[in-house]
Every structure is written in C-alpha cells, then in structure tokens.
C-alpha cells in the first residue's frame, strides 16, 4: 500500500460530517469535565504527596551518615528510588491496584492511582530536590549550625526556600508530565480523560477523531500549565 494511499485514508478518516461533529461535541464535554474533575485533581494531590516523600528522601540522602538507623534508612530510600525509576509507571499502577489485593490490601481505583503516582513523583522529585539542596553553599549550613540551629531548623529556615527556587523549573516539568501520565489511570478504570475517550470511541467505532480530541484537551491544559510555570519562574527570579 503506497504512502499516498495511506495519507488519503487518513484524511478520509478526518472527514467532518454533521454526524461526526455532533459525536465530537457530545464527547468533548465529558472529556473536558474529566480533565477538570479527575485528571487535574489527581495530578495535584499526587504531586503534593509526592513532594513530601521527595523531601524526606532527599534529606535522608544529603544528611551525613552518623549511626546505624540512618544508614538503614539510606539503604531503604536508595532501593526505593532505584525500584521506582527502574520500572514503568504503568506497571506500578497495576501492581498497586491489582497486586495488593493478593496481600489482603483492597482499595478503590482513585486512592490506588494517587498512591502509585505519589510514590513515582517522590522518587523522581527527590533527585531534583537533592541536587537543589546541595546547590546551596555549604557555608550557609555551617554558619546556621554554629549559631545554634539544629539540622532541621537550618534546613527549613535557611536552605529549603533557596533550594526550592532552584528546583522550581524541574518540579514544574514533573507536574506537567504527571498531568499527562494520569492517562495511565485508565487501566484501573479511573474515569479520566483517556478513559472517557476510550468509552466514546468504543461506542461509536470512530476512534481517530475522538482520540485526537482527547489529545487536544491534554495539549490545551499543558499550554496553560506551561504559562503558569513561566509566570511562577518569573516571580521567583
């Protein structure tokens, strides 16, 4: 089959008849609603929880090992980061939702998705935060400790917000990627944008236009998120 014939078939599949336009309009609102009510909140909640995990992991990694407990924690967080970064997010979601019930742990799709996304974000963001914490000059740590502040007080009052400014661009990109990756939650029946698109496409057998419509919604949201990212970076700078 020639390339020109394939191209012709592609444009024929995009033929916007009245019936197809009605179908696209009918599918657009549920997908847009899912983006606002499911995908975006899922990304926000998972990102916030993931940041808490990331801060904890980064602190363990940058703290000087002084005793057995810290060394054990360091080994644990290194294993966690390696495991999460070395396995696909889709597999992690499936393991949490379908695998944990084998151990007697049952949960609804949305909590399962939040847990999987949060731990994924935590592993990746921890490396970003660790690098940003280490970017703060060491003499600021030493000066604060010499003034009587303990390790956590020094971190919170002196280091954290300086490091956050450095980490903001990378963390913003992580959040935008996370929003797109919420489409993977469709495998555990969470009714986010892509799940709605699948349902509409399966019902109408008109796959390409509806999937392109879903892609358009993701793209528009990402454009808005990128604009917010640039605004935040401008304020911080």
Which residue stretches match the model-derived regions?
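Transmembrane alpha-helices and adjacent helix-loop boundaries
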Residues: 1-237
């Amino acid at each position: 089959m020639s390339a020109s014939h394939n191209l012709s078939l592609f444009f024929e599949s995009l033929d916007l008849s009245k019936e197809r336009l009605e179908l696209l309009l009918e599918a657009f609102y549920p997908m847009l609603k899912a983006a606002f009510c499911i995908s975006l909140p899922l990304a926000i909640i998972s990102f916030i929880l993931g940041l808490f995990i990331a801060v904890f992991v980064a602190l363990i990694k940058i703290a000087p090992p002084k005793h057995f407990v810290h060394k054990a924690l360091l080994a644990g967080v290194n294993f966690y980061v390696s495991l999460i970064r070395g396995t696909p997010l889709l597999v992690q979601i499936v393991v949490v939702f379908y695998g944990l019930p084998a151990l007697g742990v049952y949960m609804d799709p949305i909590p399962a998705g939040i847990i999987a996304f949060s731990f994924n974000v935590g592993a990746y963001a921890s490396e970003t935060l660790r690098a940003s914490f280490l970017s703060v000059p060491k003499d600021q740590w030493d000066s604060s400790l010499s003034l009587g502040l303990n390790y956590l007080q020094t971190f919170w009052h002196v280091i954290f917000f300086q490091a956050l400014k450095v980490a903001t661009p990378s963390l913003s990109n992580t959040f935008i990627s996370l929003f797109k990756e919420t489409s993977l939650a469709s495998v555990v029946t969470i009714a986010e944008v892509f799940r709605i698109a699948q349902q509409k496409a399966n019902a109408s057998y008109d796959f390409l236009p509806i999937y392109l419509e879903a892609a358009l919604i993701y793209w528009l949201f990402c454009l808005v998120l990128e604009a917010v990212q640039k605004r935040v970076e401008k304020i911080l700078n």
